[in-house]
Amino acid sequence: MRTLLSDRLAPITSSIGYLNVPLDTAAAGLLAWRRGLYGRVHARPVEGPLPRLIHHLEPLTGGSRSRELLVATRSPEWTAFFDCLLTGTDADTAVGQLCLSLGCKGVSLATVPHTLGTGLEPQGRYGAVQMTLYGPLRTDWLNRVRSISVAHDGSRWRFDADGTEQDFETPSAYTRRKIRDRFTSDMLAEYCAALGIEPFEEAFYGPAGVLVTSDVPTAPEGKVLRLTEAQAWFGIRPGANEQVPG
């Protein structure tokens, strides 16, 4: 399956958010939201290729996110979002809230290879390919417009699709016999491309970014790990995604 940089920066990049506004607008919105919650918030510009930008988020922290990263893309109307959560970026919370406050559209996605039981990784991970579209207005489910997901829930594969079907979708795929084939990483890339997003292309991201740091205390028993330590903790092996379907 396809992931950004073959999971070299996972778990940070296992989930990614996108806001349909330029970088400076996204940064102003994130700062305003965080200041309303935590008071003391700082922002500074950062620059470089995506791996260098992502490393500004270290160390990763369990239970709290004091560092968030906004990254310009080569589609000027889209800004990418990442954070320092140990378990991976919480794109849904940030994108959902900022779409409301900024009055824009947004996307969150997740791509996790299903390596459990394959021997490709020590512990193995439950796989998922997920995409959620957000809007500026409230819907029956927060401000989610559309959500499509194939994920292993620990006992079986599940396919779910909720909200308003979009013109760029391939609904005939949703009845395929194998559940994990109903929404694949290739399909996710095609859907994102229809919106002007190239999720798996390193060159799509940067070089400009904004690092936002909030005065959030680390959770009492939350782990604090460097990226390589987090990968060892979760048993993530970059490149394993290339050997599994999805």
Task: Give short role names for the model-derived ranges.
Residues 11-13, 74-77, 101-103:
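Short, well-ordered loop/turn elements at secondary-structure boundaries
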Residues 38-93, 107, 117-143:
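Short, intrinsically disordered low-complexity segments
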Residues 96-108:
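Glycine- and acidic-residue-rich phosphate-binding/metal-coordinating active-site segment common to enzymes
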Residues 112-116:
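Short amphipathic alpha-helical segments embedded in low-complexity Lys/Glu-rich regions
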Residues 1-39:
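Short, extreme N-terminal segment that most often corresponds to the first beta-strand
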Residues 128-246:
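Long, compositionally biased intrinsically disordered terminal regions
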Residues 1-6, 62-68, 105, 220:
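Short amphipathic beta-strand starts and helix->beta connectors
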